[in-house]
Design a protein with these regions (language model features):
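Internal hydrophobic alpha-helix adjacent to the cofactor/substrate pocket in enzyme cavities
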Residues: 381-402
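An anion/pyrophosphate-binding glycine-rich loop and adjacent beta-alpha core
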Residues: 40, 186-323, 420-517
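Extended, charge-enriched "interface" segments that sit outside catalytic cores
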Residues: 433, 450-455, 459-611, 617-623
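Beta1/beta-strand and adjacent pyrophosphate-binding region of the FAD-binding site
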Residues: 5-19
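Conserved beta-strand-loop-beta-strand element in the redox core of flavoprotein oxidoreductases
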Residues: 131-147
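Glycine-rich phosphate/pyrophosphate-binding beta-alpha loops
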Residues: 371-379, 435-437
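Conserved N-terminal/central alpha/beta ligand/cofactor-binding core
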Residues: 7-8, 25-129, 144, 152, ...
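A glycine-rich dinucleotide-binding beta-alpha-beta segment and adjacent secondary-structure elements
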Residues: 309-375, 403-416, 535-589, 594
Length: 623
């Protein structure tokens, strides 16, 4: 291969999926000359698995990304076709927006956004080598011999890195959706000293809608009052499609069990570790033998296609078995399978090789993002891409890094989990991973994170000021509700008794009534004639603040206590071999992870409270 000097840039982003997009846009918007490389420009922003954005925990990530200045939420609001707020029957901490996307529209929106972005070039090429000088990134080389000098590189390869797809005994070197795998980069990364591992994920079959009997399924409409992902989306989104629910049955399970010896998962063909929270249908059947059925959601792939996605039927069984099991499912008895399910194995890095900035510890200027870091999911990838892009830009500008803490939200929690604890399987974000769920609601992400977005230059002063005014309006409304008293009346007490709560004997403020779990801000409007016209988000924030006041105060105290440990930093050059009294396991883990603070050190698996005490005493003595 003939090499040639193809030019230079500040930052090279390798991959144009959800991580690569956010990394490239963030870096370019911060003024850095950026090139984003994609194996195929027609796959920019592709959704090779479920055609949806958000979900439990994931919707929180999208809102937080929007509050920081990312793009996913805005693109989703332009491309999504059905919106549902999950967990409405539970507390506000776990309310999570999920929306079906028109996958091709989403790609179109994102590709055009990249192409129109100042300081950003998009190129179709496979990067096969990352070059270094004096331990730092110096250039990237493509499969055609083009060498681009650069000062930083961000790896956002998704499932393409040495990917292979598996359907029964048919194994192909391939990325998702039949696209080419990225074959050349893994040996280079190993030569740079990175610890690589092999993970696996999978996807279900797709079917033609014309061959489906929807009358045998349960309709799953969108919300009657849908809301979008982006805080900047002013007009309410529109539901333009519906989903359906059906189930597997004992005949489906019998076919799977009769052919389990042909499953690559159980025959040993698949070596990669799969996602715990998105198992294949054969894994579900083998693991939960007592369950007579499993849910399957039938989801549209977009408005311009008849293809449907069968969520819950991920598999790597042979194609003939897939057809048989598909035809046992109510409504799918005559379904025409347009694409068969497959598993895909790919290379990824041990995320404990990364700093919280997502820069690798072994190569200066080399960052990882998304599935390369061991996570799963579009949303998890997008937020990591953003963090990597921002930190690469800040480092090249000589500015302080952006390190999001667990107390800041779900993005900080995700990254801390990956770089501190590591993961032995594809990591998925869930609300249960956050210790501060009530503070980290999806509805207040703008309040929590817009200030950081302003500092890094990705949120405008105008938008920041609008957020401050929004929450000032919330405070004004809370004060008004505290001061507005309602006298006992026959009408009020009848309303209270109807809603299962005690009548008022000597009057009460509206705030006191809203604090009752049986009552709502909207419902009490009957007894609040002076109520001002307020936007829905302001009304909602006021109600949440009053209803959960005690819990919120308690969690804020926990954050305050947490900050003490996080603010006690450990020196970059600390030699843990010199710290006498540390247990061997703790010493090894601390040397590998190299935590930034006592807080991070305390969360490392294998480092006990006693080890932290030893470290604190040693640090005091060092002073």
């Amino acid at each position: 291969m003939t090499e040639y000097n193809a030019g230079k840039c500040d930052i090279a982003v390798i991959g144009a999926g959800h991580a690569g997009i956010e990394a490239a846009l963030a870096a370019a918007r911060m003024g850095l000359d950026t090139i984003c490389f994609a194996i195929n420009l027609d796959s920019v922003g592709n959704m090779p698995c479920n055609p949806a954005i958000g979900g439990t925990g994931k919707g929180h990530l999208v809102r937080e990304l929007d509050a920081l200045g990312g793009e996913m939420a805005k693109a989703a609001d332009k491309a999504c076709i059905q919106y549902r707020m999950l967990n409405r029957g539970k507390g506000p901490a776990v309310h999570s927006l999920r929306a079906q996307a028109d996958r091709r529209k989403y790609q179109e929106v994102m590709k055009l956004t990249l192409e129109d972005q100042k300081n950003l070039r998009v190129k179709q090429a496979e990067v096969v080598e990352i070059r270094t000088e004096n331990g730092a990134v110096s250039a990237v080389k493509t499969h055609t011999g083009a060498v681009y000098s650069c000062r930083a590189a961000i790896i956002a390869c998704g499932t393409y890195l040495d990917g292979r797809t598996i359907v029964g005994d048919v194994i192909r070197s391939s990325g998702p959706d039949g696209l080419a795998a990225a074959k050349g980069l893994t040996p280079c990364l190993e030569a740079l000293g990175l610890s690589m591992r092999r993970f696996k994920t999978g996807t279900p079959p797709r079917v033609n809608a014309h061959s489906v009997d929807f009358s045998k399924m349960e309709l799953q409409p969108g919300d009657s009052d849908p809301e979008g992902f982006s805080f900047e989306t002013t007009s309410p989104p529109e539901n333009r499609a519906v989903c359906y629910l059906t189930y597997t049955n004992e005949e489906t399970h019998r076919i799977i069990l009769d052919n389990i010896d042909r499953s690559p998962i159980y025959s040993g063909v698949i070596e990669g570790i799969g996602p715990r929270y998105c198992p294949s249908i054969e894994t579900k059947i083998m693991t939960f033998r007592d369950k007579p059925r499993h849910q399957l959601f039938i989801e549209p792939m977009g408005l311009g296609t008849q293809e449907l996605y069968i969520q819950g039927l991920s598999s790597s069984l042979p194609e003939d078995v897939q057809v048989k099991m598909l035809h046992t499912i109510p409504g799918l008895e005559h379904a025409e399978m347009t694409r068969c399910a497959y598993a895909i194995e790919y290379d990824c890095v041990d995320p404990t090789e990364l700093y919280p900035t997502l820069e690798t510890k072994k190569v200066h200027g080399l960052y990882g993002a998304g599935q390369f870091n061991g996570s799963s999911g579009y949303e998890e990838a997008a937020v990591q891409g953003f963090v990597a892009g921002v930190n690469a830009a800040l480092k090249l500008k000589g500015e302080e890094p952006m390190i999001l803490r667990r107390s800041d939200g779900y993005i900080g929690t995700l990254i801390d989990d990956l770089v501190t604890k590591g993961t032995n399987e594809p990591y998925r974000m869930m609300t249960s991973r956050s210790e501060y769920r009530l503070l980290h609601r999806q509805d207040n992400a703008d309040k929590r994170l817009c200030g950081i977005g302003l500092r890094i230059g990705l949120i405008s002063r105008e938008r920041y000021d609008a957020v401050q005014e929004k929450y000032a309006e919330v405070e004004r409304e809370i004060k008004r509700l505290e001061k507005t008293h309602v006298a006992p009346s026959e009408e009020l007490n009848a309303y209270l008794e109807e809603h299962g709560t005690a009548p008022v004997l000597s009057g009460a403020s509206l705030a006191e009534l809203i604090r009752r779990p049986q009552l709502s801000y909207e419902g009490l409007g009957l007894f609040d004639p002076e109520r001002p016209e307020l936007p829905r988000p302001v009304r909602y924030q006021a109600e949440i603040s009053l209803k959960y006041e005690g819990y919120i105060r308690r969690q804020l105290k926990q954050v305050e206590d947490f900050a003490g440990m996080e603010n006690r930093l450990l020196p970059d050059d600390i030699n843990y071999d010199e710290v006498t009294g540390l247990r061997l396991e703790a010493r090894e883990k601390l040397k590998k992870i190299r935590p930034r603070s006592f807080g991070q050190a305390s969360r490392i698996s294998g480092v006990s409270p006693a080890d932290i005490s030893v470290l604190m005493v040693w640090m005091e003595g060092r002073r």
